[in-house]
Swiss-Prot record:
Record protein name field: Flotillin-like protein FloA
Cellular compartments per GO CC: membrane raft; plasma membrane
Taxonomic source organism: Desulfitobacterium hafniense (strain Y51)
Membrane topology of the entry: Multi-pass membrane protein
Physiological role: Found in functional membrane microdomains (FMM) that may be equivalent to eukaryotic membrane rafts. FMMs are highly dynamic and increase in number as cells age. Flotillins are thought to be important factors in membrane fluidity.
């Protein structure tokens, strides 16, 4: 059954009105606007609409603004929105400003926003300025002049320096510098007993070096938590050096032995070479004698005299060899 247009028109208008109201309440955070008015914060409807158009969540701006207004801070909507669009944490910055205000720490919004955009936790920095933080260093090994190793563990009490949070070094630098100072201080000690008797000497020496320069912290104190005696590094190094010297000496002795063996073989070869030359020279003697006899330079009697001399020499050699062999076979008891 078809309803008359006079009956349908009010229903259509009511539906359109409900849709329009729902769209308005969805696009315009009326509840947030009412909360701001109740808190005494002047935020216009069109300001909230502009936030929607700029893809800014109004609650991320209005709630911190209400908090800052109640804390007595002079912060504008434009400042908070600009920091939000830059990728900052608006709520954390406002909390840091409130904490700094309560602790009487001078901190402006621009400075807090810069610290937050630099990746630092500005709220933690303010809290650390009020309540210093204790940093425990890992075990640091150092060797005194007498060669004894000491293993030291220290506690460093630091306070955040808000003025140096942007661009200042972090905790890792503090730990590295303290470890370096401990190694230097122990290394300059004559013996490890002095360090064990007076460990605060190390902490005073390290603290006097100004290790917090260029960092985001101010070192309040350095306390030696634990000192343990380690290895005798000096004796170990001496042992290693002696072993190395021994190996070097053995290598040099082996080199000299090899050179002596090579020299011996060289001399044997040289003797064989000389013997070959003697044999070669002896083979020329008969030819020379024949030449001398033929040319009349050597007489027959001279030749026989030389033969007698050679026979006597050979006989003496045989007698000498026989005497030596008898002596070797019958040694004296």
């Amino acid at each position: 059954m078809n309803m008359p247009i006079e009956v349908l028109m009010p229903i259509i208008l009511l539906a359109l009105a409900l849709i329009l109201i729902s769209v308005v309440f969805t696009f315009i955070p009326v509840g947030l606007w009412i909360s701001a008015l109740a808190a005494g914060v002047n935020v216009g409807i069109f300001t909230l609409v502009g936030m929607r158009l700029r893809r800014v969540t109004p609650s991320r701006i209005v709630n911190p603004l209400i908090k800052a207004h109640k804390a007595g801070l002079r912060v504008t909507t434009a400042q908070l929105e600009a920091h939000y669009l830059a990728g900052g944490n608006v709520d954390r910055v406002v909390n840091a400003l409130i904490a700094a205000e309560r602790a009487a720490i001078p901190l402006q919004f621009e400075r807090a926003a810069a610290i937050d955009l630099a990746g630092r936790d500005v709220l933690e920095a303010v809290q650390m300025s009020v309540n210093p933080k204790v940093i425990e260093t890992p075990v640091v090994s150092a060797v005194a002049k007498n060669g004894i190793e000491l293993r030291v563990k220290a506690r460093v009490t630091v306070r955040a320096n808000i003025d140096r949070l942007v661009g200042g070094a972090g905790e890792e630098t503090i730990i590295a510098r303290v470890g370096e100072g401990i190694v230097t201080s122990i290394g300059s000690s004559l013996s490890h007993e002095k360090v064990l008797e007076n460990p605060d000497m190390v902490s005073r020496t390290v603290l006097a070096k100004g290790l917090d320069s260029g960092t985001a912290f101010e070192i309040l104190s350095i306390d030696i938590a634990d000192v343990d005696v380690g290895k005798n590094i000096g004796a170990q190094l001496q042992t290693d050096q002696a072993e190395a010297d021994k190996r070097i000496a053995q290598a040099k002795a082996e080199e000299r032995r090899a050179m002596a063996v090579a020299k011996e073989q060289e001399m044997i070869a040289y003797v064989q070479e000389m013997r070959a030359k003697v044999v070669e020279a002896e083979s020329e003697v008969p030819r020379a004698l024949a030449e001398a006899l033929k040319e009349g330079k050597l007489g027959v009697m001279d030749y026989y005299t030389m033969q007698n001399i050679m026979a006597d020499t050979s006989m003496r050699d045989n007698i000498a060899r026989s005497s030596n062999s008898n002596t070797d076979s019958n040694p004296k008891k």
